[in-house]
């Protein structure tokens, strides 16, 4: 009679698990659709009646256990009975009653299921060297024979024919001509008492009657010949004994599979080969109600279900997860039951599948437990071996687990939370079980109408995504209905959607793609973006065109989140479908003015608050600006961040938004300058300390410089280059340059003016002190050295500049140094102009200029050389160089200048003289051969001249002993040939100086008045042959010297010498040179 255990009710579980709906989510109407009906999971608990039947079956199995235990099994029956009592939750009194009742039941028929597999290495009894083996086997019931007695030993050597009745003897087939026969035949051998029963197997060689001629034809060796003689002595048709196997049943395990040696009856041939035997103790006619009414595999399935349920429950009670391994007690009981019921491996696997697949739907344990029975069923699947009822039960288990698995997949976000570390592996294991199940031949034959698994999973994921979205929407539903509250709720919902998509992309998509090739992320994004788009669009319409600041802030956060959501989506392609969020920025257009005004208002408040809190104290030794500059930098960075967040897609509107951002930023910069100066005045008025006022002014200038650096980075922070590329096709050429860059340059110009004004104020405080110290240099006593005279000035600058360097950033300090340097040069020029006649004062000013240059350069830390060496500096340096020189030094410089002029002159428009000059060091004689002059100017009225040449060694103070020399005068000659030689007795040392020269003055002799000047030529003595080397000079080379005139506008050196009225030598030199200049001016060509 069938019970609830044997006929599980079948239901359309797939339809309950998931409804296939093809329409898109965009067609969903609010309110959200009703959730799909949950899968009805069949309970794994049994009714009391079913439990009693199963408990009886388990007790019966333990009580009628046969054979030795397996190595890892429990040996004691009491331990197994206690385990069953705990597993079935039976009270002690009830357990004892059930135990007594089971013991009173009729014992089963004990059977030994023996399988003769094969033999190897048996004796060859035939003439051919082979045998025709067969086996006789049975069970001998021994009564009253002591173990180890002589009778027992004799009986073990006895053959089956003599010990077991013929009706209880079983025989295998005969295998012809082989020494390694294979039978694989199974026999069921009944016995009553395992303690006195033994298994006997005899192996025989079948002997058939053959003629001597036939045997001689099969003869192969001498051993075969001996076999012929031996057989001739025995009876015709008598089989040969090959060996036997005798085993006590009580020594066998419940299942045995071994090779046993074939024993001889005599010691003639001790090695007779081996026989492969399999044994299994089974029951017939079990007296339990379950065994009489239900299929064996069904009872085993229910027993397995009960024990596994107990194992899982025990682990959960101990706060540990079950690792899919059964306890030794459970393994022993299940092994005994399957063996006693003679369940095949296939039916055991099927029972395991039915039990585990049902328990998985109600208990928590690894889904990997299902893989082993799936693999076993697939490996052993033969459809014909199952009855219709079994096929239906297996098909129901497939559809039930599939429906349950799809329901878990639909709710995977809550069933497999990422807060639990093993959730991804558990989901992956479930998917692999479903994949393996749907790939089975059994599944394909029993569930032919099932849709492909990937399609079912995709639809489950799609519906699960929609259900999750509506659940989140309900979770964020505001308590108070209002546009602001609705916006906050929608923002939270969008952020949850993004978080879910991030999880899908990082974790879940990899699992679904690897197992089923399903792109979960793309599917979830497409579904969720339609749902989000409809709600956002409705919300922006409800917000209207006039957006308040609070609502505008909420809309901006929502816009930024949607922008991030769109960027999170799959990579766009040309063939992708239109998304609901495409062009979503247009929904927020009315809110743009509110966003821009909010950004400026917040920034302005921050600037005002930062200035008000600023005490104008540097932040540290390396940071010379104050707190408001840092706050301002953060404020402008926030504006740039807001602009990047906005990143408006429309190019033309994006350009206008950027213009507004730049305009507001520049306006805030100028506002800050006004506020920080006012703050400085406010604090200075309170403290009334000039030094602290200077400190604060330094901080103000530094803050402005820091602000200038921030403003200068606007093109990078607001990505002007990218904007220019985007608006290139929309704006006119140069419009961006004329607009944005004009705004930026205007702001930078305003900041530069403010900085220069502040630095100028600081410079003015120092300029007075610098001018005072420079003026004091003039009044210092003559006995004081110039280096000592400038010490007060240098100490003043060292203190002040060190202070400024400490309190100003490098850019402002450099600007201050530039202003001070310019002012210092101006003061030095004025003082130097008033002291031209005093070489002492000029010397001090010269030393001061040199030290000031070093001071302002500061070993590279101050102004660079190109900033120091201005035109004013160069001119002043030259003037002071001359003014500080003595009269003789000035004369020397004059001749150096004329020598340089002579070297640079190539034109012979005044004529030229040709000379040979050499120096004989041994005699200290300078030899001058004046050869000729040519192309002289006609200075007489007759168109000719009366030239002669005056030779002098200059300067005179270097050659005081040497008198001038003259050549003869040539009448009316413009190309005179003098050919005269002059020798000057002079030492070599003065001749080697750079300013020492031979002055050749060509004059036109005038009898009535002063001689006229034809021109001058300056020959440097340091280049004369023989002057520098010790060897006597050879033939001196000719030198052609163009004639020159003195400078027409006067020479500054002469003017300086002229100002020294009390120096007679200077006045005499100036008088001579003025005379020459006057003569030159009268006849200049």
Swiss-Prot record:
Ca(2+) 1 binds at residues 126, 132, 205, 207. Keywords: Calcium, Cytoplasm, Endosome, Exocytosis, Lysosome, Membrane, Metal-binding, Phosphoprotein, Repeat. Mast cells. SUPFAM superfamilies: C2 domain (Calcium/lipid-binding domain, CaLB). The keyword Metal-binding applies. Plays a role in cytotoxic granule exocytosis in lymphocytes. Required for both granule maturation and granule docking and priming at the immunologic synapse. Regulates assembly of recycling and late endosomal structures, leading to the formation of an endosomal exocytic compartment that fuses with perforin-containing granules at the immunologic synapse and licences them for exocytosis. Regulates Ca(2+)-dependent secretory lysosome exocytosis in mast cells. This is Protein unc-13 homolog D. The lineage of its organism: Eukaryota, Metazoa, Chordata, Craniata, Vertebrata.
């Amino acid at each position: 009679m069938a019970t609830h255990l044997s006929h599980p009710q079948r239901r359309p579980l797939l339809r309950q698990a998931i409804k296939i709906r093809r329409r898109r989510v965009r067609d969903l109407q609010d309110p959200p659709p009703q959730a799909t009906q949950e899968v009805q999971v069949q309970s794994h608990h049994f009714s009391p009646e079913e439990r009693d039947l199963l408990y009886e079956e388990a007790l019966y199995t333990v009580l009628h256990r046969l054979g030795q235990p397996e190595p890892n099994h429990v040996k004691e029956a009491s331990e197994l009975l206690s385990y069953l009592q705990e597993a079935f939750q039976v009270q002690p009194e009830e357990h004892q009653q059930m135990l007594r009742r089971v013991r009173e039941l009729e014992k089963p028929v004990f059977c030994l299921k023996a399988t003769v597999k094969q033999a190897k290495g048996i004796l060859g009894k035939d003439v051919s060297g082979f045998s025709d083996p067969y086996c006789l086997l049975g069970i001998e019931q021994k009564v009253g024979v002591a173990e180890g007695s002589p009778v027992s030993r004799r009986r073990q050597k006895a053959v089956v024919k003599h010990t077991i009745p013929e009706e209880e003897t079983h025989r295998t087939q005969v295998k012809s001509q082989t020494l390694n026969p294979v039978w694989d035949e199974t026999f069921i051998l009944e016995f009553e008492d395992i303690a006195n029963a033994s298994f006997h197997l005899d192996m025989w060689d079948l002997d058939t009657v053959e003629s001597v001629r036939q045997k001689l034809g099969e003869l192969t060796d001498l051993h075969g010949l001996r076999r012929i003689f031996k057989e001739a002595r025995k009876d015709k048709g008598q089989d040969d004994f090959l060996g036997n196997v005798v085993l006590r049943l009580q020594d066998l395990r419940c299942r045995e599979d071994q090779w046993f040696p074939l024993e001889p009856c005599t010691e003639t041939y001790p090695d007779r080969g081996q026989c492969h035997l399999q044994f299994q103790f089974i029951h017939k006619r079990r007296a339990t109600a379950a065994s009489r009414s239900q299929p064996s595999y069904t009872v085993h399935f229910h027993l397995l279900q009960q024990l596994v349920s107990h194992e899982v429950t025990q682990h959960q009670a101990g706060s540990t997860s079950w690792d899919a391994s059964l306890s030794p007690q459970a393994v022993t009981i299940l092994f005994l039951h399957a063996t006693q019921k003679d369940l095949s491996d296939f039916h055991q696997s099927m029972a395991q599948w039915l039990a585990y697949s049902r328990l998985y739907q109600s208990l928590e344990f690894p889904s990997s437990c299902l893989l082993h029975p799936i693999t076993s069923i697939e490996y052993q699947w033969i459809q014909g071996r199952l009855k219709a009822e079994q096929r239906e039960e297996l098909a129901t288990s497939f559809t039930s687990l599939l429906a349950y698995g799809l329901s878990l997949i639909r709710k995977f976000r809550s069933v497999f939370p990422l807060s639990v570390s093993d959730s991804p592996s558990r989901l992956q294991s479930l998917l692999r079980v479903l994949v393996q199940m749907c790939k089975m031949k059994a599944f394909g034959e029993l569930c032919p109408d099932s849709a492909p698994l990937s399609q079912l999973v995709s639809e489950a994921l799609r519906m699960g995504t929609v259900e999750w979205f509506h659940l989140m929407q309900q979770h964020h539903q505001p308590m108070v209905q209002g546009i602001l509250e609705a916006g906050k709720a929608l923002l939270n919902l969008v952020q949850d959607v993004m978080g879910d998509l991030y999880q899908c992309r990082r974790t879940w998509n990899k699992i679904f793609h690897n197992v089923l090739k399903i792109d979960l992320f793309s599917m979830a994004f497409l579904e969720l973006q339609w749902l989000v788009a409809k709600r956002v669009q409705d919300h922006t319409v409800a917000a209207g065109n006039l957006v308040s600041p609070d609502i505008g802030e909420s809309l901006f956060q929502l816009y930024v989140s949607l922008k991030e959501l769109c960027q999170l989506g799959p990579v766009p392609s040309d063939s992708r479908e239109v998304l609901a969020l495409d062009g979503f920025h247009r929904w927020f257009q009315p809110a743009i003015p509110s966003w821009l005004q909010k950004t400026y208002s917040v920034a302005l408040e921050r600037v005002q608050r930062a200035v008000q809190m600023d005490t104008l104290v540097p932040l540290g030794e390396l940071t010379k600006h104050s707190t408001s500059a840092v706050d301002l930098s953060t404020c402008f960075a926030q504006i740039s961040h807001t602009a990047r967040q906005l990143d408006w897609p429309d190019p033309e509107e994006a350009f206008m938004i950027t213009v507004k951002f730049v305009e507001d930023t520049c306006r805030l910069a100028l506002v800050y300058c006004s506020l920080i100066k006012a703050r400085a005045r406010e604090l200075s008025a309170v403290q009334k300390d000039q030094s602290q006022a200077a400190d604060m002014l330094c901080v103000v200038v530094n803050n402005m410089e820091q602000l200038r650096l921030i403003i200068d980075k606007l093109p990078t922070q607001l990505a002007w280059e990218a904007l220019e590329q985007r608006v290139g096709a929309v704006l006119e050429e140069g419009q961006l340059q004329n607009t944005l860059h004009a705004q930026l340059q205007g702001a930078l110009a305003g900041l530069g003016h403010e900085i220069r004004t502040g630095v100028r104020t600081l410079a003015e405080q120092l300029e007075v002190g610098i001018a005072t110290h420079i003026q004091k240099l003039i009044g210092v006593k003559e006995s004081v050295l110039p280096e000592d005279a400038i010490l007060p000035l240098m100490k003043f600058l060292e203190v002040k500049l060190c202070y400024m360097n400490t309190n100003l950033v490098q850019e402002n300090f450099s600007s201050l140094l530039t202003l001070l340097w310019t002012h210092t040069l101006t003061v030095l020029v004025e003082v130097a102009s008033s002291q031209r006649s005093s070489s002492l004062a000029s010397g001090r000013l010269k030393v001061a200029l040199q030290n000031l240059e070093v001071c302002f350069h500061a070993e590279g830390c101050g102004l660079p050389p190109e900033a120091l060496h201005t035109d004013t500096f160069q001119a002043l340096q030259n003037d002071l160089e001359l003014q500080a020189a003595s009269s003789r030094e000035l004369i020397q410089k004059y001749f150096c200048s004329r020598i340089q002029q002579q070297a640079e002159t190539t034109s012979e428009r005044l004529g030229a003289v040709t000379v040979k000059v050499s120096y004989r060091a041994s005699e200290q004689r300078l030899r001058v051969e004046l050869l000729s002059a040519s192309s002289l100017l006609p200075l007489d009225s007759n168109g000719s001249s009366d030239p002669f040449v005056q030779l002098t060694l200059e300067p005179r103070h270097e050659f005081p002993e040497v008198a001038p020399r003259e050549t003869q005068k040539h009448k009316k000659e413009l190309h005179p040939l003098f050919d005269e030689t002059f020798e000057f007795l002079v030492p070599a040392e003065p001749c080697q100086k750079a300013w020492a020269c031979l002055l050749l003055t060509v004059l036109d002799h005038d009898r009535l008045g002063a001689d006229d000047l034809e021109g001058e030529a300056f020959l440097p003595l340091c280049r004369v042959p023989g002057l520098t080397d010790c060897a006597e000079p050879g033939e001196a080379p000719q030198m052609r010297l163009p004639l020159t005139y003195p400078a027409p506008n006067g020479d500054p050196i002469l003017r300086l010498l002229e100002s020294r009225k009390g120096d007679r030598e200077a006045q005499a030199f100036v008088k001579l040179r003025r005379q020459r200049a006057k003569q030159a001016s009268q006849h200049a060509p």
